[in-house]
Amino acid sequence: MSYAIETFDPEIFQAIENERERQTNHLEMIASENFTIPAVMEAMGSVFTNKYAEGYPHKRYYGGCEYADVVEQLAIDRACELFDCNYANVQPHSGSQANGAVYAALIKAGDKILGMDLSHGGHLTHGSKPSFSGKNYHSFTYGVELDGRINYDRVMEIAKIVQPKIIVCGASAYAREIDFKKFREIADEVGAILFADIAHIAGLVCAGEHPSPFPYADVVTTTTHKTLAGPRGGMIMTNDEDIAKKINSAIFPGLQGGPLVHVIAAKAVGFKHNLSDEWKVYAKQVKANASILADVLIKRGYDVVSGGTDNHLVLVSFLDKEFSGKDADAALGAAGITVNKNTVPGETRSPFVTSGIRIGSPALTSRGMKEIEFEIIANKIADVLDNVNDSELHAKIKEEMKELASNFVIYDKPIY
């Protein structure tokens, strides 16, 4: 049986080729995106895609799972080593699935949860009204102050008033370090479970470039892509055996059926990469590159929320500009620089328009770019923002960025 994609399905083949070309020639600067290594992609495309394996290692509902058990146990063991925890569930299909499982395992419908406001940098699954987390639970929010930072005393005040069952700490657009110890103190004060979502910063945490949520958080979730640069997926971790059992039941049979064994194999490969000395060097460079990006944009007169960054992302506000985040996103895209429009603290526009953009350093750092390239790119971003309607300038910068990108090819041959 041989069905080479190029001849069997030329439409899909062409779409893949076009996307590979786009990723190669454009500068990917969406903070939640990264480039994974070929070994991860090979595992994703392996024969494990054919295998059903409902249950957990050595406790399956299907036969023929002996090798599925091997890869899942490797993924679990490596995850626990990576984050210095006792239990890990590597089956969640996504970060949102992982977060949903935490709620399902530990609280009831209608219980109170306290998470970061979406427009202040939180995530949909932290209690936003359109999300299941805002519909199934009674959600409340905390935010950032005028300086763009979390005021932990204010979070304590809100928690005392709300008396939530779960406090969610973590964000999707917060550029500063999260103080998990202070969140632990707040949770203890009101008798709440502390749930840390480290999806955006996990790759920094495991390299020692951001404080760990352990031992402070009761339960921790993450995606396995983003700063971890693995396959798209989710994971849940804890040091509490009782919570681990509840989490396992919430994932299967609660929210999911058969796990994606090929993805779990890829997660294990990704974790091996994250455990290397090379990874620590990479994570340090991710932060250094983001810092340069923030510094240049500030020098060029742009409002960087919180005045800088401690991690992999930079949030830029256009509340004082006539153009919107949507306008900036489109202009930068035309210049060969891919970012995403993003809400900002004090947002006045709709979520489809926004007053800001979120920019990240992980993907370009994976391509080998360092401070010198990020200084060039940051200035080009500022040039575009200074001339958001100048299509001729955008086209010129696009060619310049394509030339820069050609020196940092991420995949030298197709991986399929």
From Swiss-Prot:
The protein's name: Serine hydroxymethyltransferase
Source domain of life: Bacteria
Pathway membership, UniProt: One-carbon metabolism; tetrahydrofolate interconversion; Amino-acid biosynthesis; glycine biosynthesis; glycine from L-serine: step 1/1
A Gene Ontology cellular-component term: cytosol
Organism of origin: Sulfurovum sp. (strain NBC37-1)
NCBIfam families: PRK00011.1
Any Gene Ontology biological process: tetrahydrofolate interconversion
Family the UniProt entry places it in: Belongs to the SHMT family.
Location within or outside the cell: Cytoplasm
Keywords of the record: Amino-acid biosynthesis, Cytoplasm, One-carbon metabolism, Pyridoxal phosphate, Transferase
Tagged with keyword Nucleus: no
Name of the coding gene: glyA
Role noted for this protein: Catalyzes the reversible interconversion of serine and glycine with tetrahydrofolate (THF) serving as the one-carbon carrier. This reaction serves as the major source of one-carbon groups required for the biosynthesis of purines, thymidylate, methionine, and other important biomolecules. Also exhibits THF-independent aldolase activity toward beta-hydroxyamino acids, producing glycine and aldehydes, via a retro-aldol mechanism.
Oligomer status and interactors: Homodimer.
